[in-house]
Amino acid sequence: MQHNSLSQRNGQAAVEACSEVTARRTCFLSAHSYCCELEDGAIILELATGAYVGIHAEYLPHLRIRIQNWPDSHGSAQVTTNATITESESLISSLVDRGILTTSPAPKRSSTPPTPVAAMTTGSAIQRSGTPAKHLMQFMMSLWTVSLRHRDDQLASLVGLLSQRQHLIRRVQRTATLEDAKKMLVAFLRLRIWFYTADRRCLFDSLVLALFLSRKKIPCTFVIGVSTKPFLAHAWVQIGEFVLNDTAEHVQTFTPILAVGESN
């Protein structure tokens, strides 16, 4: 009996030791997971499914240490109490099981885009934008691409396509002026009114606009931002500090969680 009891204790100790090692594996946000911190915690966007996961602030001190490519906090979250290591490791294990975290090394995301300070005005470009019909084919191709893939499980492929197109624009180092961008924005707005409304369709509209500009070799940034209390997600397109399809005041109420384009 003593021998069996000793064996059981040794076996239990081995299991606990193994569990401890497993729990402390180096972790990374996976390639399709995007994260940002807010005052009351963090939000993770799981791009493969389009799902958002909320993380309470009490877990953040441990996650910042354990997840190697966790975004810079900049002291955004207000942490008053910390979760225990056991609780934090349980959360990490759950995120690994869901594919949100991985043990395979993944790079840290590049810096967030500049905060928009104004909406891009198009008044001076209206007369010089040309006939919208000359841009119709590029508009239709962009609209068609987004329409076919505008589902939560296809968002990753759209973001990937946009990233590739913007990377090619940066690689050839083509210089596009703000006037070029204004002309294309005017053409886009004139064409959009015949095909769909952007009301309550910020994600759809922003994807179509970003792809249209990319086809026209205009560097831009597609952004998804989030806020809490209540939770909201919003999408927009910007060039530098100018937002193209919203107001600066509105987008400033959101924290960018994903940015693809000129600033990345």
PLM feature segments, named:
Residues 1-65, 122-143:
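Acidic, low-complexity/disordered tracts enriched in E/D and polar residues
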Residues 51, 55-157, 161-170, 216, ...:
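Long, charge-rich, low-complexity alpha-helical segments
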Residues 53, 244-245:
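Short, isolated positions in well-ordered beta-strands
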Residues 125-201, 208, 214, 238-239, ...:
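Secondary-structure boundary elements
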Residues 216-229:
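Short, well-structured beta-strand/strand-turn elements
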Residues 230-234:
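A short, glycine/Asx- and small/polar-enriched loop/turn
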Residues 254-264:
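Electropositive, surface-exposed helix/loop patches at the edges of structured domains
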